[in-house]
Amino acid sequence: MREEEIEKIRGVVRDCVSKHLYSSAIFFADKVAALTNDPSDIYMQAQALFLGRHYRRAFHLLNASKIVLRDLRFRYLAAKCLEELKEWDQCLLMLGDAKVDDDGIVYDAKDGNVIDFDKDGEDREINISSAICFLRGKAYGALQNRSQARQWYKAAIKADPLCYEALECLIESHMLTSEEESSLLSSLQFSPEDGWLSSFYSCLIKKYDKESTVELKFKKLENETSGSVSGSSMITLANNTDLLACKAEYYHQCCEYQKCFELTAALLEKDPFHLKCTLVHLAAAMELGNSNELYLMACNLVKDYPSKALSWFAVGCYYYCIKKYAEARRYFSKATGIDGSFSPARIGYGNSFAAQEEGDQAMSAYRTAARLFPGCHLPTLYIGMEYMRTHSYKLADQFFMQAKAICPSDPLVYNELGVVAYHMKEYGKAVRWFEKTLAHIPSALTESWEPTVVNLAHAYRKLRKDREAISYYERALTLSTKSLSTYSGLAYTYHLQGNFSAAISYYHKALWLKPDDQFCTEMLNVALMDECQNGVDSKVELC
């Protein structure tokens, strides 16, 4: 057969693959390989077999070829076949010997020399070495060697910043602390035209920077244009669903749950099967107590994705929201059974125990989550909260400090450190932690942070810094006028100052919120007696 005729059949194979006609592709690729015995045609046949899900046959074909030992493409495809067959040890053997350190630097196993993965700056294909590093990471992850998996994922993204999947695994499996994520991102060598990608990656990692910094990142990406003009409008990333899902996640971290919910709801109208956005939407609905939305989302997810952990996690969220914690726990457990690396279900499982004050089971679940997700500070933080609930304040403080080491920019960590210091009567330390909490809040203060402001006021009152205490109580009232603690604290501070008329006024406001509050009732009587003994304030008009 002439070369032109063979080339024509190669074209047929490529066309069959593009049209997903894999049996046809296998048929014609087999004939081309038989006619030429050329390595490229053998590789094309193996590709067709792989796409047609004939993994054993594809592996046998590649392994029988001597070139598999010399050509990285052959070795990588053979390893991909073993990945699909779940033969992870054999997959690692096929990929060859290499060592990696914690910085993601790869060394030759024989001579110990550093392997350089630099690629041509003009090359827009993913570096094959990066893909091999990523596959090694997946294999180690499947073998439960998360430390090696983390190192190989780092090696993959360092070998080629275009290998997004490696970064995705590092982020979603919480393998890195917030500082490690930032350090990794700053070490990546982006080409000049990939500046937008660097900005996008910076939006994907943990976002605890100040609002102005994060908003600037989003604004920069939203203004990124394609360089082409359609009609009179520029094409930008402003309405990209991935970018908007990142922004929704940021709103959730800032405790702006209503804003987050509205954005994710709009996104899911546009793209109802965007699963990352769906997860953020579920989290926002949980915080808002929107059980109807959780029910509808859970029903749709179970119908569309019955084999995904997210679907059963959504069912668990619904039951958790309506306070049926045993049922919630059952579905969180089902989600972790489907995907053991799905961190929200692991944490939700622990929370379902904590909600019923079953501390031992809750801490056991949190410890498992902390071991599996070393870059996520929430399990460690929740262990501290459980210890604090049982008045084991020193142990609680230790775990809060561990959480701070993992994520030093989350204001919630500093708030809990302040609370435990307050309980240990270390009021000066409590003031410092609460002030750090307010300093780390990325956006303007909202009602969610009102308890922190009140706690700071309480700590100042304990130090008898009444002026500062009153200032923060009044600041808390600008955030919420429904807090008994704020009114009673303000009343008591005025009472200590000898300002009985103001104290009486605020005790009344506190009792309006909770008429049977024993402390305010008793202190109101004391304040009235004190005012009688000191004479009626001339400024108070008697009716």
Curated annotation (Swiss-Prot):
Major location category of this protein: nucleus
Assembly: The APC/C is composed of at least 10 subunits.
The gene coding this protein: APC6
Tissue: Widely expressed.
TPR repeat ranges per the UniProt record: 7-36, 39-64, 72-95, 128-159, 164-187, 194-232, 242-270, 277-304, 309-338, 343-371, 378-406, 411-443, 447-479, 484-513
SUPFAM superfamilies (UniProt xref): HCP-like, TPR-like
A GO cellular component entry from the record: nucleus
Name this protein carries in UniProt: Anaphase-promoting complex subunit 6
Species classification: Eukaryota, Viridiplantae, Streptophyta, Embryophyta, Tracheophyta
